[in-house]
């Protein structure tokens, strides 16, 4: 069995047995895929008690939790985990059955091919990205707080790695070509540019990530594409599904 859900932002209560009772029939060979903004690796320098509790709690679920990165992850820590090969692609194992599916990889799950490409551009940055080491950091932060302008702080609440590198994009295309540009499912955080234009306002504009996913959309044959990021649940045409708090079975 494979289920898909959207952004968690470190709130994993949707996976308790009262809400997600289907897990009683699941084993570690069954999967729940989170479409980015997992948020379980967030504390600045190391895993704190709160994170440990929830990562251990997820590990104790009968299923295996998988996630792609969103734009709200601590990439310094996430990328500090050893890279391992798992089911055909590169991963970071937060726990034995809590696994980060790295960008541009193709995974074999339950006999189906999944192309995964997480990440997105943060849009809650009207006040800019602040440098915590800058001499005027506290002054700028105070001014922005007073004006109620949203901002992010470098290496504390924002990381440039939220956006894929050129190398990751190229690796993704190479991996897809090895499968003749044909997969069963695509998992991402944001979506292709043409898809995004169908349902969002001016808050979200095209960028290098959505343009790359547009290239994937035009080049690759796929059955279904699931993505998060936009905090809603809706079908965008017959093949693309925006998902947030719902947990839906796909296999």
Model-derived features with residue positions:
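Short aromatic-enriched loop/helix-cap "lid" or pocket-rim segments at secondary-structure transitions
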Residues: 46, 79-81, 126-129, 198-200, ...
């Amino acid at each position: 069995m494979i289920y898909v859900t959207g952004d968690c932002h470190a709130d994993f209560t949707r996976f308790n047995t009262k809400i997600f009772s289907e897990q009683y029939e699941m084993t570690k060979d069954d999967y729940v895929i989170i479409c980015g903004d997992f948020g379980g690796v967030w504390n600045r320098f190391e895993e704190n008690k709160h994170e440990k509790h929830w990562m251990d709690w997820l590990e104790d679920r009968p299923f295996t939790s998988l996630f792609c990165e969103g734009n709200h992850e601590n990439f310094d820590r996430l990328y500090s985990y050893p890279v391992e090969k798992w089911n055909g692609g590169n991963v970071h194992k937060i726990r034995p059955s809590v696994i980060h599916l790295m960008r541009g990889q193709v995974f074999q799950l339950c006999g189906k091919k999944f192309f995964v490409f997480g990440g997105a551009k943060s849009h809650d940055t009207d006040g800019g990205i602040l440098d915590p080491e800058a001499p005027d950091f506290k002054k700028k932060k105070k001014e922005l707080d007073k004006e109620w302008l949203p901002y992010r702080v470098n290496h504390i609440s924002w990381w440039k790695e939220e956006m894929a590198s050129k190398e990751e994009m190229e690796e993704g295309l190479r991996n897809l070509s090895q499968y003749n540009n044909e997969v069963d499912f695509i998992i991402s955080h944001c979506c292709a540019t043409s898809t995004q234009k169908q349902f969002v306002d001016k808050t979200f504009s095209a960028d290098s990530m959505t343009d790359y996913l547009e290239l994937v959309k035009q080049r690759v044959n796929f059955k279904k594409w699931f993505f998060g990021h936009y905090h809603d649940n809706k079908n965008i045409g017959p093949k693309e599904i925006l998902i947030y708090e719902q947990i839906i079975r796909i296999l």
